[in-house]
Amino acid sequence: MRSGRYIGVMSGTSLDGVDVVLAAIDEHTVAQQASYCHPIPQDIKMAILGMCQGQAVTLSALGQLDTRLGILFAEAVLTLLKETELRAQDITAIGCHGQTVWHEPTGDAPCTLQIGDNNRVAALTGITTVGDFRRRDLAYGGQGAPLVPSFHHALLLHPVERRIVLNIGGIANLSLLVPGAPVRGYDTGPGNMLLDAWIWRHCAQPYDKDAMWAMSGQVNPLLLRRMLTDPYFALRAPKSTGREYFNLSWLERMLAGLPPMAPQDVQATLVELTAMSIAEQVLLVGGCERLLVCGGGARNPLIMTRLSALLPGIEVSTTDECGVSGDDMEALAFAWLASRTLSGLSGNLPSVTGASQETVLGAIYPVNAD
């Protein structure tokens, strides 16, 4: 593997910021050295949300958003370099996931689209950039997601302990790590996505800090049962999903015809949906000794409490307790995937995505030679 300093850039479905992380990576270790979260301007955030929820968009608007996101990602990297007093020459490459605006891995013409022009990232930072990680897996019949389980396996596999790494971002996904067995992983369903969208609509807050609003409400069993009957939860793996499926339009369909309820009760019920849909999948794959949680949902005390209650006998903790920052996990993963791409090594796991073979992921955007 090509060792060096790498920067990972991740803008996830939760849209809570652009996560940028600096790590020293070699064949055996991934050592995080610095991190930074760059704000996403509100107009860009709203444009992304509109596209993800199927609003009509012109090619001009899509192209301009692609450019603006590329510039934004470059600004995030340059800010991290300034904070760490490093130069572009000190960095081997950037692994830039991009912003998913559509993910449709099934049907006659499976597709996934991450925007944020990597040409701009490379040009503005002066650093070789690796991006467009998902579509090669799709080309081999895979879901294109999740890709992070290969990183979980490299970093958090235990010699004897059966573990599940659970990432709760906008969407929740799990990685089953069993010594001596192939990795399994998939998207379980909504993580923070519906929670954030609902509190933004009713309270104009980007997220429910410490789950205070949800804890002021009561779970509505009728709504919960209706949501849990959604066909996605019964699908067999490999499977993946996103904001184009689980969004406020989906929630409004679930609420249709039910007696009126307080918005905080809906919020409480959405927390229970996230916790129950995760817990059911944890049990479906045979459980584990330790559930390691990362992503923004790891900071939601109500989700963590409910997971512990729904999974008795399983130790529920965070990846931070294993020395890996839960907030930076995905950005770290794409820094690591960039190192594998530059080394000509595969980055996907067919046992997770359903692809017909392992493959090198992504496209490389080199900088001009001096």
Swiss-Prot record:
Would the keyword Kinase turn up in this protein's UniProt record? yes
Alphabetically sorted, this entry's keywords are:
ATP-binding, Carbohydrate metabolism, Kinase, Nucleotide-binding, Transferase
Taxonomic superkingdom: Bacteria
Q: Which reaction does it catalyse?
A: 1,6-anhydro-N-acetyl-beta-muramate + ATP + H2O = N-acetyl-D-muramate 6-phosphate + ADP + H(+)
EC primary class: transferase
Pfam families per the UniProt record, alphabetical: AnmK
Query: Which residues are listed for ATP binding in this entry?
Result: 12-19
Pathway(s) annotated for this protein in UniProt: Amino-sugar metabolism; 1,6-anhydro-N-acetylmuramate degradation; Cell wall biogenesis; peptidoglycan recycling
Which residue spans adopt a coiled-coil conformation according to this UniProt entry? none
The answer to whether keyword Membrane applies is: no
Q: What Enzyme Commission number(s) does the record list for this chain?
A: 2.7.1.170
Which GO terms are recorded in the biological process aspect for this UniProt protein?
Answer: 1,6-anhydro-N-acetyl-beta-muramic acid catabolic process; amino sugar metabolic process; peptidoglycan turnover
Q: Which GO terms describe its molecular function?
A: ATP binding; kinase activity; phosphotransferase activity, alcohol group as acceptor
Task performed by this protein = Catalyzes the specific phosphorylation of 1,6-anhydro-N-acetylmuramic acid (anhMurNAc) with the simultaneous cleavage of the 1,6-anhydro ring, generating MurNAc-6-P. Is required for the utilization of anhMurNAc either imported from the medium or derived from its own cell wall murein, and thus plays a role in cell wall recycling.
Member of which family? Belongs to the anhydro-N-acetylmuramic acid kinase family.
Q: What is this protein called?
A: Anhydro-N-acetylmuramic acid kinase
